[in-house]
Amino acid sequence: MAASRRLMKELEEIRKCGMKNFRNIRVDEANLLTWQGLIVPDNPPYDKGAFRIEINFPAEYPFKPPKITFKTKIYHPNIDEKGQVCLPVISAENWKPATKTDQVIQSLIALVNDPQPEHPLRADLAEEYSKDRKKFCKNAEEFTKKYGEKRPVD
């Protein structure tokens, strides 16, 4: 139950502070271990859409890290076709129980805004990003327009 108490507090903080890049947060009050929300990137080529993510917290949270899955398809070297993301802050070896969910979300937004081709989950996209940025951006922008969700209007 410690996980639920902490998650309730973290959710309250996030809602109170109003993160402009993480919106439309949905949490089932009966199950605080699953959150959904929209990532709203600032940087091209992802600034034309929003991306729904799901955050799954283990029952052992905060002693074990959450898992993040993209529910919206995204053309990104660090996010695979199944929506799994390579995010160092939530890897088992880097995870620290003091890390809060808003920090995890900020790291995720930073990664989406600024891909890390040196740690790819999709080598083909990492190569395209590194060798032909213009082509990558064109493909990613088209993909975002096709699959991305509507950005929330303030």
Curated annotation (Swiss-Prot):
SMART domains recorded: UBCc
CDD domains associated with the record: UBCc_UBE2L3 (cd23801)
EC class: transferase
Catalytic activity: S-ubiquitinyl-[E1 ubiquitin-activating enzyme]-L-cysteine + [E2 ubiquitin-conjugating enzyme]-L-cysteine = [E1 ubiquitin-activating enzyme]-L-cysteine + S-ubiquitinyl-[E2 ubiquitin-conjugating enzyme]-L-cysteine
Modified residues (N6-acetyllysine): K131
Pathway assignment: Protein modification; protein ubiquitination
Gene3D superfamilies: Ubiquitin Conjugating Enzyme (3.10.110.10)
Post-translational modification: Ubiquitinated. The alteration of UBE2L3 protein levels during the S-phase of the cell cycle is due to ubiquitin-dependent proteasomal degradation. Autoubiquitinated in vitro.
EC identifiers of the protein: 2.3.2.23
A GO CC annotation given for this chain: nucleus
Superkingdom, taxonomy of origin: Eukaryota
Residues annotated as catalytic: C86 (glycyl thioester intermediate)
Compartment list: Nucleus; Cytoplasm
UBC core domain segment(s): 2-149
This protein's UniProt keywords: Acetylation, ATP-binding, Cytoplasm, Nucleotide-binding, Nucleus, Transcription, Transcription regulation, Transferase, Ubl conjugation, Ubl conjugation pathway
A Gene Ontology BP annotation from the UniProt entry: protein polyubiquitination
Single GO molecular function: transcription coactivator activity
Domain notes: In contrast to other ubiquitin-conjugating enzymes E2, residues essential for lysine reactivity are absent: Pro and a His residues are present instead of an Asp and an Asp residues in positions 88 and 119, respectively.
Biological role stated in the UniProt entry: Ubiquitin-conjugating enzyme E2 that specifically acts with HECT-type and RBR family E3 ubiquitin-protein ligases. Does not function with most RING-containing E3 ubiquitin-protein ligases because it lacks intrinsic E3-independent reactivity with lysine: in contrast, it has activity with the RBR family E3 enzymes, such as PRKN, RNF31 and ARIH1, that function like RING-HECT hybrids. Accepts ubiquitin from the E1 complex and catalyzes its covalent attachment to other proteins. Mediates ubiquitination by the CUL9-RBX1 complex. In vitro catalyzes 'Lys-11'-linked polyubiquitination.
Protein family (similarity comment): Belongs to the ubiquitin-conjugating enzyme family.
Assembly mode: Interacts with PRKN; involved in ubiquitination and degradation of misfolded proteins. Interacts with UBE3A. Interacts with CCNB1IP1, CBL, ZAP70, RNF19A, RNF19B and RNF144B. Interacts with ARIH1. Interacts with ARIH2 (via RING-type 1). Interacts with NCOA1; they functionally interact to regulate progesterone receptor transcriptional activity. Interacts with NDFIP1 (via N-terminus); the interaction mediates recruitment of UBE2L3 to ITCH and causes MAP3K7 ubiquitination.
UniProt protein name: Ubiquitin-conjugating enzyme E2 L3
